[in-house]
């Protein structure tokens, strides 16, 4: 690695203004750093039994959501700025794609509930919640009605569903928004996807109105022209 770094630095001489080249060198350095630091971050053998229990995790388990949560905390401790955890699988008996069957939702929810609660407690106990934002979300909900008689499933439902945020800059222990009595439409305090994104960006210290990309001679906002920060949930 030292030899590669030497050649990269030699190649950069006289080309310091080439941002693409500097970024290329930086990407190689980042990749090398992941290879050297990654194995230690993913090694849970030194975590205590009580911590494993907190996440509902058995030693040696590398597939569960609890494993993802504990690794996520370890990555954040080591300076990783963005971590994504995903629950679900492609197996027909373990995924959230409930078009034909929702009877496994209780089991799916239990498998997520224990680890995510453990993660929040662990972050708080370690003093990490003050500068960590936890966003628990999905791409859409499930409708309140059976679209096909006799089939215990639900279709995609984008009109109303829930997400939650915890951590830095967010009020705790509150609910914002309300559905109608059937869970079919929003009845109060609508939060659009653009509002949700705007609020997350605000909590990350980013002005969503200035975060733009250039296309066809115009500047476009990632939150479009509709996004507004949901100030009611801010601490």
Q: What role is predicted for each listed range?
A:
Residues 1-235:
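Ligand-binding pockets and gating/stacking loops
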């Amino acid at each position: 690695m030292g030899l590669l770094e030497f050649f990269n630095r030699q190649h950069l001489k006289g080309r310091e203004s080439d941002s693409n080249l500097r970024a290329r060198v930086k990407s190689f350095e980042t990749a090398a750093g992941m290879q050297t630091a990654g194995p230690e971050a993913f090694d849970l053998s030194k975590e205590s039994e009580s911590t494993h229990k907190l996440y509902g995790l058995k030693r040696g388990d590398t597939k569960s959501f609890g494993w993802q949560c504990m690794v996520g905390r370890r990555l954040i401790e080591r300076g990783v700025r963005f971590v994504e955890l995903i629950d679900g699988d492609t197996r027909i008996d373990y995924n959230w794609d409930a078009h034909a069957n929702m009877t496994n939702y209780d089991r799916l929810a239990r498998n997520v509930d224990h680890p995510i609660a453990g993660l929040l407690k662990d972050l708080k106990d370690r003093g990490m919640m003050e500068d960590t934002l936890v966003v628990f979300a999905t791409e859409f909900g499930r409708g309140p009605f059976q679209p096909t008689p006799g089939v215990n499933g639900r279709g995609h439902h984008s009109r109303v569903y829930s997400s939650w945020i915890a951590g830095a800059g967010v009020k705790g222990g509150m609910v914002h928004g309300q559905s109608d009595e059937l869970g079919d439409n929003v009845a109060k305090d609508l939060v659009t996807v653009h509002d949700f994104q705007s609020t997350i960006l605000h909590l990350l210290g980013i002005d969503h109105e200035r975060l733009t990309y250039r296309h066809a001679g115009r500047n476009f906002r990632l939150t479009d022209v509709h996004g507004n920060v949901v100030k009611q949930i801010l601490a």
